[in-house]
Amino acid sequence: MHILVVSVNYRTAPVEFREKLTFQAAELERAMTTLQNQKSVLENVIVSTCNRTEIYAVVDQLHTGRYYIKKFLADWFQLEIEEVAPYLTIFEQDGAIDHLFRVTCGLDSMVVGETQILGQIKDSFLEAQQVKATGTIFNELFKQVITLAKRAHSETTIGESAMSVSYAAVELGKKIFGELTDCHVLILGAGKMGELALQNLYGSGARKVTVMNRTLSKAEIMAEKYMGHAKPLSELQCALLEADILISSTGASDYVITKEMMTKVEKMRSGRPLFMVDIAVPRDIDPAIDELEGSFLYDIDDLQGVVEANRAERLKEAEKIQFMIEEEIVLFKTWLSTLGVVPLISALRDKALAIQSETMESLERKIPNLSDRERKVISKHTKSIINQLLKDPILVAKEIAAEEGADEKLALFAKIFDLEMEDVESRAEEVEHKRVWTPSVPSL
């Protein structure tokens, strides 16, 4: 079995391509179920955010797994593999494990050290568990990753100076306007990104804020928290006439603001400029709007320069976290290496218990007048003897499994205890394809 990551992210692809490979939240479970039925794929988790779409998979063959995951991406988004391939980065084995740790800890984010990705990884993992797309390996790996990411943020100061993408959008507005007190700000979208932007706007002195959302009640709840006003999305054109700054993050699949709409609005704004920051992927605002004279459009990739603040300080903390990651990878690989010895240990235990059971039957035939209490006491103590005898051999087997040339040594181990290899191999196949649903993960 092999661990594989296929990634398209802000480093490898511009936003105009990333938006073509973005899974909507409502379709994520169906996507993981579909991927689970692809050839070679044994387990999978799909993570799709504004800055990355990544497929984490356990596959039986690396070459076959790579091909069918790329084919799945191309087919799902109705593209050719040749269109998708140049923008993909593929991580395998140790590189894949390290990448998952780094992403979850915020070390691979545009904003180094941000914590939002931790929640996104956790949510994706839980969704994958719901549709039984994870198994023995990913259930262990993702729980270990989430636990470490939480510890990394509590034991270092990397998150203290990190800014979110929403914060960066507000900072860009401040660079352009200076004080935001007299600016009319329009927020499109009442999700997490929109609320973070509104929270940062309020902290920067903005008080003339309008929130718009397809579901008006969500906009009203969010606006009320920060002394803003809520309006239905049907009044968007009128709201654009009043705004000085627009921050948009709706999660819509099509443009919410088109060039045609903005052309009409500009004619009624009497030359007043409108600064628009689109932090949605797929984008909410037609990029062609940037061609208009009075509209100044920035997308999520344009925020790179803004988020560089305090980067050197955060990179020092990132080095500490990378060391923690390397320690965790060693622990995970040790666990992974012992996974293959589980069927051998299981066969050894079963053989020992079979001997104990036969011994108890023989004893009961020879001493038929045993009371129930006496039978239980004898059974308990004979099982205790077995456990004591097996303790050291099992520990040795686990140590051997982590060594080079383990297969030959474990074969000798099986021969010493006269274990049937066909039975061991059958158990190994069961472990390999086992789906274990363990929904409890560390809280954030």
Swiss-Prot record:
Alphabetized UniProt keyword annotations: NADP, Oxidoreductase, Porphyrin biosynthesis
Record: residues binding substrate: 49-52, 109, 114-116, 120
Active site: 50 (nucleophile)
Signal sequence, renumbered to the chain: none
Main enzyme class: oxidoreductase
Gene Ontology biological process terms from the UniProt entry: protoporphyrinogen IX biosynthetic process
Listed InterPro entries: 4pyrrol_synth_GluRdtase (IPR000343), 4pyrrol_synth_GluRdtase_dimer (IPR015896), 4pyrrol_synth_GluRdtase_N (IPR015895), GluRdtase_CS (IPR018214), GluRdtase_dimer_dom_sf (IPR036453), GluRdtase_N_sf (IPR036343), NAD(P)-bd_dom_sf (IPR036291), Shikm_DH/Glu-tRNA_Rdtase (IPR006151)
Enzyme Commission number, as recorded: 1.2.1.70
Record pathway: Porphyrin-containing compound metabolism; protoporphyrin-IX biosynthesis; 5-aminolevulinate from L-glutamyl-tRNA(Glu): step 1/2
The reaction(s) this protein catalyses: (S)-4-amino-5-oxopentanoate + tRNA(Glu) + NADP(+) = L-glutamyl-tRNA(Glu) + NADPH + H(+)
GO MF term (any one): NADP binding
Sites where the protein binds NADP(+): 189-194
Keyword Secreted found: no
Residues under site feature: Important for activity: 99
Function noted in UniProt: Catalyzes the NADPH-dependent reduction of glutamyl-tRNA(Glu) to glutamate 1-semialdehyde (GSA).
UniProt domain comment: Possesses an unusual extended V-shaped dimeric structure with each monomer consisting of three distinct domains arranged along a curved 'spinal' alpha-helix. The N-terminal catalytic domain specifically recognizes the glutamate moiety of the substrate. The second domain is the NADPH-binding domain, and the third C-terminal domain is responsible for dimerization.
Family named by the database record: Belongs to the glutamyl-tRNA reductase family.
General remark: During catalysis, the active site Cys acts as a nucleophile attacking the alpha-carbonyl group of tRNA-bound glutamate with the formation of a thioester intermediate between enzyme and glutamate, and the concomitant release of tRNA(Glu). The thioester intermediate is finally reduced by direct hydride transfer from NADPH, to form the product GSA.
Assembly and oligomerization: Homodimer.
Name assigned to this protein: Glutamyl-tRNA reductase
The species this protein was found in: Bacillus anthracis
Name of the encoding gene: hemA
